[in-house]
Amino acid sequence: MEIASNKGVIADASTPAGRAGMSESEWREAIKFDSTDTGWVIMSIGMAIGAGIVFLPVQVGLMGLWVFLLSSVIGYPAMYLFQRLFINTLAESPECKDYPSVISGYLGKNWGILLGALYFVMLVIWMFVYSTAITNDSASYLHTFGVTEGLLSDSPFYGLVLICILVAISSRGEKLLFKISTGMVLTKLLVVAALGVSMVGMWHLYNVGSLPPLGLLVKNAIITLPFTLTSILFIQTLSPMVISYRSREKSIEVARHKALRAMNIAFGILFIIVFFYAVSFTLAMGHDEAVKAYEQNISALAIAAQFISGDGAAWVKVVSVILNIFAVMTAFFGVYLGFREATQGIVMNILRRKMPAEKINENLVQRGIMIFAILLAWSAIVLNAPVLSFTSICSPIFGLVGCLIPAWLVYKVPALHKYKGMSLYLIIVTGLLLCVSPFLAFS
């Protein structure tokens, strides 16, 4: 039923425009694609093309291509569905300033700080992953190309300088991040596509391997599931993205639509380009190279720069360097946004219990978070944290935060009951598989 107003005819309540209390013309104007939408698509793609894509070929090389294909059939559809659900549960929240406040709005302050802490731990692990990756891989490239005699990563201060620069850039605001990330992300997409095509000439059918026994295939597919998901995963940027849209848009429906649209565009681009690249790279890089990369704790691209020879080797090495460095840099930016938001939510939750909100110095809190982030990332670099092991360890937390908690909210909160359905069962099953994955990996 359409309702007349001084702004025009409000659309039927069953349509997005109607739910937003707008006419169709007002709705079209409100959801116009703008520079902010482009920025969040770029940030989402930048987040996804990070440790996932540069480390996935190592895991696939260790496990086999058949395992990867099975985990892809399970993982990619589930990933799309749970990222969509994650956005919807955030967008519906009465208060949307940070992840802990969203949970607090649904379940109360105690649940907010508990589940916010879980979300925080997931982001801490990814801070470890990217800070270690950018330090080790950049040092490896500089050494491989003869720029340095030894590995700069042997010095703890090299990593400290890198992290200080990245955190300083990340803390300057969304607009600067969008500008810096756009060129790097577009370059990454072109490089991923070009590298996938260039690898075709180096394919070897024996790298396909034989089909393993069913039991072993299923077990290894579950172990590989976290690596498959993280190859195009950008859940770390979804919370900052929804919060950004909620702060900009008066209508929750408009904010939800824009966030879902950005997610859909990013997912579609990533799936087409990254899946082809991952399969192509895996067919070109054998098991021995994967083992070597695992033992050296470096990415597949870093090891490719060492083993590729013949015509085009120089080009492959150069674009591998560009992809790897840009990948971990833009992914670090995305993770830092989520980390800052999660940390601020926990700190503010605690401080509001101790003092009135108006007495809290938010600028001081943000500076403290910057220093904390630098020290945290530097500690991972000094310890040379094993990246692939962290991905497995993070799996249960990711299963809880990305799948099981949103699913639980759907059953717990009446306003979210509309999201029940078969897709929710797939999300729950995927969450449970992610929870058991590391136990199978280390068994």
Swiss-Prot record:
Protein name, UniProt field: Serine transporter
Gene Ontology BP term (one): D-serine transmembrane transport
Protein induction: 40-fold induced under conditions that maximally induce expression of the locus of effacement (LEE) large pathogenicity island (PAI); part of the dlsT-yhaM operon. 3-fold induced by D-serine during mid to late exponential growth.
Outcome of gene disruption: Decreased secretion of a number of substrates for the type III secretion system (T3SS) encoded in the locus of effacement (LEE) including Tir, EspA and EspD; at least EspD is also decreased intracellularly. Expression of 105 genes is altered; down-regulation of LEE PAI (including the T3SS) plus other genes as well as up-regulation of 21 genes. Decreased ability to form attachment/effacing lesions on HeLa cells; those which form attachments condense host actin less well (pedestal formation).
Location (main, coarse): membrane
Transmembrane segments: 38-60, 65-87, 111-131, 150-170, 183-203, 215-235, 265-285, 319-339, 368-388, 390-410, 422-442
Lineage, uppermost ranks: Bacteria, Pseudomonadati, Pseudomonadota, Gammaproteobacteria, Enterobacterales
Membrane topology, record value: Multi-pass membrane protein
PANTHER family, A to Z: SERINE TRANSPORTER (PTHR35334), SERINE TRANSPORTER-RELATED (PTHR35334:SF4)
Alphabetical keyword list: Amino-acid transport, Cell inner membrane, Cell membrane, Membrane, Transmembrane, Transmembrane helix, Transport, Virulence
GO cellular component term of the entry, any: plasma membrane
Underlying gene: dlsT
Source organism superkingdom: Bacteria
Subcellular location: Cell inner membrane
InterPro entries in alphabetical order: Amino_acid_transport_2
Family according to the record: Belongs to the amino acid/polyamine transporter 2 family. SdaC/TdcC subfamily.
Function: Transports both D- and L-serine; allows growth of strain CFT073 cells normally unable to transport D-serine on that substrate. Transport relies on the H(+) gradient and is not competed by L-threonine. May play a role in L-cysteine detoxification.
